[in-house]
Amino acid sequence: NNAVKVFKFTVKPTIGDVGIRVQDILLLDIIKNNLADRPIHISTTTGGDSNLGLDEYLQMQGLTFKLVPERIYETGNVVNEKVMREHLFNTNTLQTNNYKPYYQPGFKFRGLDDKSNLFFDDNHFRMMQSYRGAYLNLAGYYINKDQKDKAIETLNFMNKIISVNRVEMEDNLFFKMVMIYRQLGAYDQFSKYGMKFVDKVTEKIKENRVSLE
């Protein structure tokens, strides 16, 4: 069978309603010249407006989206579970100097737990939300597959290595996590993090740093 797989997508204007940006043209050129020969990945940190209407074909793998030749919403494979687990759970947190001269899957998290006293600036804060988003997406995958224990395990592990006491969690991610715990029946975690979220938002309201719209 020599049938050629074809996928179609619509590139919407990214400059008003009349044109597309230089970086969009560059990505189109990369896809055109490399799709048949090598994998193409787009960073999860670039924002949805950089995906050129390819969202249906972008599968999450760690902190990148891989361009795949099938609609992820039809297959249910919004994330690559095997790759995600390799990166998010193989963290080598107890072997902080375990560096190798070759590729090893897994993110190395250090100084992000309750025992740390490191300083974090806004760049660190934003990056940690990307990592947390990956854990939440993996948990969502397990929920859709009716694997509740793995979903709870994923959230618990995330909170162990990236403590909300050390690195503040964005309000929308925090609320999403709390409600997932509730959905899964993990009421101890729901109560614990729910109270932390309420305290956090209450403090912001007092300081006029939160919008209730």
Where are the regions that the model predicts?
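ER/secretory pathway lumenal C-terminal domains and tails of membrane proteins involved
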Residues: 1-213
